């Protein structure tokens, strides 16, 4: 009788363990959308909020949570009564929602300082999830650059308010002093090498500077210039730097200057590209193919 009771307990525990394993196997997938963030309400609505909504509408079986990676933006918004989660807080939120699988998608363009911070955070918590998938920044490889150029070109051609085919196009990025800044030069070289000699790349805070861009503009001898933000969120940088400093300086040199008023995050093509990346990651974590290697293609 005693042996039978022991056997019954063993069978019961085995069934419980099997059930728990199946629950973990079929556990919920959490999607973490990581944005640098912005204090510009209108820009946030047109980019971050719009992408968040599209992701939630597309992946209805997943829990979707956003995070801001810039502490300064989080603090600034908090003073206005707008609460945004940090990456660690957002991950905790997904845990609370019962997510055993994690997909991390950022809207960062370059593999810079903020991406390194995100990598460390994901590596720190990946042991807490059965499966984790995270992809590289939007501009990482030559193919990424080609795709971005193609999408920007499509967006410009679709906008009837400008005629980019008759203008010198200047993509204006943020820029930094990190090695990731070299990506801007790669894009500029790629444009010239693959048939767009009237397209140029400059940065607000890195290389190539506005001085370098002016030299390139002078070489083409077309007085019509279109400034295009190479920024996920145009926001204050477009208002103060692109539509301000850059436009005014080039106008003073005799150029006829127009500004394309959309950041990359407002472009439907860019949003769809990001959703495609998320779909591939969700498929990987749900099928068990994700190997917890962070920041793959």
Question: Language-model segments: what does each one mean?
Answer:
Residues 1-7:
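Bacterial N-terminal signal peptides that target proteins for export
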Residues 8-17:
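Bacterial N-terminal signal peptides
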Residues 22-297:
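Active-site-proximal alpha-helix that buttresses catalytic centers in soluble enzyme cores
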